[in-house]
Amino acid sequence: MHWGGHFRTHKKLNGELLTKAVNVGLNYMNVGVENGVNKILALMEKGQTSDDVSFFLKSAHESNVFYNANWIPGYPKENHMDFMLQLKFLYDNHKYFGNNGLLNLMQSTDILDHTPLDVYRDDFEVSKEKTMLNSWVSNDTKNTLMIRHLKAFFIEVMLKSFQFTKEGDELIGDDFSYATPKEKGGKPPY
């Protein structure tokens, strides 16, 4: 029997516990790591630090569990230095993705009605009036949909240079390897 699901990073999810879970059928984890910068993780109220995220990535890598790490570039209040720190975090931790980890690059953050980002727009420095292409804009207009997509593009270029695996038929090409689950004939360590 195989099982998997949605997870969050936690200090108790160490290599030993994850290896035990793999031994009883864990074969897929969708994990909300979201970012590698402490400031952004605090704004998201994730209750984790970049060290916690790095520890989880290392533990998942060592246990050979297949995981998909969700990543959000361009979160409200993210500045250029935060983005550079994200790139450094990915550079420092790219070795933990190997053949069993994927980075799910989420192109942009939407602000849905009645969510904390909507209710506390002033705190997140998001304009209440200005939009561009029907998407939110920061008060200083340094965070727009186009900037968020450009950041995602830069991360894609970096991922390509590190030969990260990518998931999805639209990303298959000479430059990307495709991670296939074990049930569909994928290669170990799935």
Stretches found by the model and what they are:
Residues 11-12, 76-86:
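Active-site glycine- and acidic-residue-rich loops that bind
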Residues 18, 44, 73, 80-82, ...:
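A generic "cationic amphipathic patch" detector
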Residues 73-76, 109-111:
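Short beta-alpha junction loops
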Residues 81-190:
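C-terminal accessory regions of radical SAM enzymes
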